[in-house]
Amino acid sequence: MRYLCGVSKQHTMNKYYQILKKVLADGKTQKGRKGESRYLLNETVTLSPAELLDIFEGHNIARKKLRSELSLFMSGERQVEKYREAGINWWDYCGSILVNSYPTYFEKLPPLISKINREKRSSKNYVLFLGSTGTESNQAPCLSLVQFQIEQGELVLTAYQRSSDANLGLPADIYHLYLISRQIELPLKSITINLGNVHIYENNITHTR
C-alpha cells in the first residue's frame, strides 16, 4: 500500500480531512471495475503550507519513493522496470511500458519550471496539460492540469484532478504537487486541487474512519 490515512479530531480543521469526512457522511454509492465506493463530485481543496505539513506528518506517505517517482516522471522514463529498481511496484500492472501516462506529460515540466523561474510574470498563467481524449493508454493520468500563478511574489499552484481516491491516492498527489512547487523559486502561498470525482472505496471505509 502506498499511503495510509485516517480522520482524527486534531485534524478536523484541515481541509483535506474535511473532504474525507464529507465523503464518508454525504457520499453517494457507485459501482465500478475496482468495486463499490462512496463519491462526491466537483469538490475543491485549498491547502496552506501549514496544512500541507500537517498532512505529510500525519500520514505514512512513502516520501522517498514518491520523490523518486516524480523524478522518473519528469525525466520521461516509461520503462516500468526503472520504477521497480527504485522500489516502486504500483505500476507493475501496466506491463513493461507506461503508455501515454504521467511520464509523457511530466517530461514537459522541467522546461516549464525553468521558464517560470526565468520570467516570474504575475500577469501570465503557466499551465501543464496532461492527457488526451481518445489516446490509447494503460493508465491515463488522473491529474489533468497543473497551473502556476504568481500573486504578490508568492506561488499559487492549482490543479484539476478528474478522479481521486481520497484515502490512498490523494495524499500522494498532494505531495507530488508540493515537490513540484519546491522547484519554483518563490515562496508557496497555497495549493488548490479541484476534484472532479473524489471517492473512498468501501473496503477502506473502516480504516478511513
Where do the protein language model's features map onto the residues?
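Terminal, non-catalytic protein-protein interaction segments that mediate quaternary/complex assembly
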Residues: R2-R209
